[in-house]
Amino acid sequence: MLAKRIIPCLDVKDGRVVKGVNFLNLRDAGDPVENALYYNEEEADELVFLDVTASHEKRKIIIDVVERTASVVFMPLTVGGGIKSLDDIRDLLNAGADKVSINTTAVKDPYFIQKASTRFGSQCIVIAIDAKRVDKNFNPKAYPPESWFDDKELSDVLYKEDSRFVLSTHGGRLMRPIDAIAWAKKMEEFGAGEILLTSMDRDGTKEGYDIELTRAISEAVSIPVIASGGAGTLEHLYEAFAYAKADAALAASIFHFREYSIREAKEFLRQKGIPVRI
């Protein structure tokens, strides 16, 4: 069995690492390069770097921060936020990113993932899925359609009456009538090499990952799934692997504020029978 990965996430606004509840009311958790160095020393398996305001405020990607971070860490670095073109991907990879994470642009144009994976390779294209639970009262017509909603090749990803989870974009601010599980399968088909799956209902709450959501998507695809949103204890990390079948667990605040170290997390998981790199 492949080793399970522990991945800290640096949510960045204005060049500073922040972590809020549901991406709002952000807290300041320090300098991104300092955080990256800390995680490098702690032997985190990877690092995810997300500009949480890039899509919403239409800010350009902070290439210099990526370059400074990539120059001092030796673990794989995934970078997302505000990626709108193939040139943006090229610039990030040239700046030192190993992978790029794409959400809003893929929702606007699903074929962008096909183009990106063809040009740069599936191994560096991560589809970020920010999912929210819905019930029978959800009204898909309350949300503006995308231009591709009439595309027959993509009709299977649209919201249906039995959909349990839909996509959200722009940092969770905008819900979309797109079924999250069907979308994950389509993005794999289009060439995405990995899924960064965030439960927007759990993000920042420290109540644990959404096991039902994560397991449903992990079982629907064959590419790796990173569980995100809700980690508050080491037991939550264990649950992501043991029950939700995730390949990796992402967390921010429990590591940023030094409640637990990466080493503590890995030792805890090892003792519970989860294969990790020590």
From Swiss-Prot:
Record-level GO BP terms: L-histidine biosynthetic process
Active site: D11, D130
EC class: lyase
Keyword Cell membrane: no
Entries under SUPFAM superfamilies matching the protein: Ribulose-phoshate binding barrel (SSF51366)
Keywords, alphabetical: Amino-acid biosynthesis, Cytoplasm, Histidine biosynthesis, Lyase
Name of protein: Imidazole glycerol phosphate synthase subunit HisF
Organism: Thermodesulfovibrio yellowstonii (strain ATCC 51303 / DSM 11347 / YP87)
Gene this chain is encoded by: hisF
